[in-house]
């Protein structure tokens, strides 16, 4: 077999491969022999069909199958011989497929970039520290109460935070539009569920009242057919209900699995959850800074095949998350390219750090992470057991731990500054970083 490789770009390779005709003929004959043993042809006993008849009937298909298999196997042999690491499937360009002659084809593909991760010393990280103060705990209890708000019908005009039961019909240019009408919809005023002006226009309304709202859809509205257009909504208020916060009592605590210990036990459990959230938030922010630093100090070119595959994965995730009747490939690729590039580049960099420093998942840390996650459940021992009985889930935890070990490796050489902040600041989400 003859192989030659041309570097067409930094990552693209054009590999010309010539396979001896004898190898093709051997594969063709092998298939014909297998076919002859099981072929059922009128006038012949099974296994007794002349080879000339087998070739006449099945020769073309056998050759096509043989060529496909030989291309696949010879491509693999060639990349091993040339010590290439393909990123994605090759594009095959046949040059000579004529029977009795050598098979010639060209495989065009990308390879993974070869690089050494460096620049740890130039990475700066601000590592936060915080405690859960009593005031933070009290604020969280208020949030939990609000999340479990009950609504009771009130005989008064609607206010912000009231829940209204409404019927409405929306029209654009006098015509009812799809998705613009509903009956018996529950709407909390001030929730921001509806377009600007809708909820505000119902403040002061009473049960049985009808209001007409003339509103304009935002220019960036998700339904492009309605974006920027003026609509008329006729709204009938069926009921007005006011919010009632639940008392901090045994009934309320039981909703969170706390059946004993009263308010003190409930506060203890909530504090534990807040401390767990705090640890995770601090760890996540340190990790994001490290990853940003690795991106900045290790610019690498991304194989287009990997980028395309990642865009496809993000499209599927978006459809699964937001639902709807849209197909993944209907979502514009450019919506996901920055995120896809960041994920692909970081995946390559992290893999290279693991390779350079010969990192292996620390099984003690794996168990510690599983126990930390399990502590959020009422039966933590069962959760731990479930992870260790599910190899796929266990390997996912190992991957997360390995990534943490990469972060620790970088932190050993990076410039790290410790900073004490409030609980609220420590857990506050940061804006998702973008790819360069």
UniProtKB/Swiss-Prot annotation:
Q: Report the GO terms under cellular component.
A: cytoplasm
Question: Known EC number(s)?
Answer: 5.2.1.8
Q: Which Pfam families match?
A: FKBP_C, Trigger_C, Trigger_N
InterPro entries the record matches = PPIase_dom_sf, PPIase_FKBP_dom, Trig_fac, Trigger_fac_C, Trigger_fac_C_sf, Trigger_fac_ribosome-bd_bac, Trigger_fac_ribosome-bd_sf, Trigger_fact/SurA_dom_sf
Q: Where in the cell is it found?
A: Cytoplasm
Q: What class of enzyme is it?
A: isomerase
The highest taxon in the source lineage is: Bacteria
Reactions it catalyzes: [protein]-peptidylproline (omega=180) = [protein]-peptidylproline (omega=0)
| GO biological processes | 'de novo' cotranslational protein folding; cell division; chaperone-mediated protein folding; protein transport; protein unfolding
Q: Where is the PPIase FKBP-type domain?
A: 161-246
The principal localisation class reads cytoplasm
UniProt keyword list: Cell cycle, Cell division, Chaperone, Cytoplasm, Isomerase, Rotamase
Give any GO molecular function from the UniProt entry: peptidyl-prolyl cis-trans isomerase activity
Q: What does the record's free text say on domains? A: Consists of 3 domains; the N-terminus binds the ribosome, the middle domain has PPIase activity, while the C-terminus has intrinsic chaperone activity on its own.
| Task performed by this protein | Involved in protein export. Acts as a chaperone by maintaining the newly synthesized protein in an open conformation. Functions as a peptidyl-prolyl cis-trans isomerase.
The family assignment reads: Belongs to the FKBP-type PPIase family. Tig subfamily.
Q: Which PANTHER family match?
A: TRIGGER FACTOR CHAPERONE AND PEPTIDYL-PROLYL CIS/TRANS ISOMERASE (PTHR30560), TRIGGER FACTOR-LIKE PROTEIN TIG, CHLOROPLASTIC (PTHR30560:SF3)
Protein name per its UniProtKB record: Trigger factor
Q: Which organism was this protein described from?
A: Pseudomonas fluorescens (strain Pf0-1)
């Amino acid at each position: 077999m003859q192989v030659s490789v041309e570097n067409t770009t930094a990552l693209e390779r054009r590999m010309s491969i010539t396979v001896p005709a004898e190898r093709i003929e051997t594969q063709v004959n092998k298939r014909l022999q297998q076919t002859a043993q099981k072929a059922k042809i009128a006038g012949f006993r099974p296994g007794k069909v002349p080879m000339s008849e087998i070739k006449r009937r099945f020769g073309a298909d056998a050759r096509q199958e043989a060529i496909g298999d030989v291309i696949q196997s010879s491509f693999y042999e060639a990349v091993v011989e040339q010590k290439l690491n393909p990123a994605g499937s090759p594009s095959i360009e046949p040059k000579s497929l004529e029977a009795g002659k050598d098979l010639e084809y060209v495989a065009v593909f990308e390879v993974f970039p070869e690089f050494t991760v460096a620049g740890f010393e130039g990475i700066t990280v601000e590592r936060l520290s915080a405690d859960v103060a009593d005031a933070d705990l009290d604020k969280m209890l208020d949030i939990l109460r609000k999340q479990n708000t009950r609504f009771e019908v009130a005989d008064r005009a609607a206010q912000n935070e009231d829940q209204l039961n409404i019927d409405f019909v929306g029209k654009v240019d006098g015509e009812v539009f799809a998705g613009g009408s509903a009956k018996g919809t529950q709407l909390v005023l001030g929730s921001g569920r509806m377009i600007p002006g809708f909820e505000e226009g119902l403040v002061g309304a009473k049960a049985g009242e009808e209001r007409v709202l003339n509103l304009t859809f935002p220019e960036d509205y998700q339904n492009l057919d309605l974006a920027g257009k003026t609509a008329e909504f006729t709204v009938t208020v069926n009921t007005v209900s006011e919010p009632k916060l639940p008392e901090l009592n045994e009934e309320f605590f039981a909703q969170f699995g706390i059946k004993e210990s009263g308010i003190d036990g409930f506060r203890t459990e909530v504090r534990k959850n807040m401390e767990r959230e705090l640890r995770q938030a601090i760890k996540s922010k340190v990790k994001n800074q490290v990853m940003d630093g690795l991106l900045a100090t290790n610019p690498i070119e991304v194989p287009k095949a990997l980028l395309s595959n990642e865009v496809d994965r993000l499209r599927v995730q978006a459809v699964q998350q937001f639902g709807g009747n849209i197909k993944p490939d209907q979502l514009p690729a450019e919506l996901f390219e920055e995120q896809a590039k960041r994920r692909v580049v970081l995946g390559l960099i992290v893999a290279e750090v693991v390779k350079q420093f010969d990192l292996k998942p620390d099984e003690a840390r794996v168990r510690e992470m599983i126990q930390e996650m399990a502590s959020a459940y009422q039966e933590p021992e069962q959760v731990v057991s479930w992870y260790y009985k599910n190899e796929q889930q266990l390997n996912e935890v190992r991957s997360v731990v390995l990534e943490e070990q990469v972060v620790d490796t970088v932190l050993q050489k990076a410039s790290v500054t410790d900073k004490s902040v409030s609980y609220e600041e420590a857990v506050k989400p940061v804006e998702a970083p973008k790819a360069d």
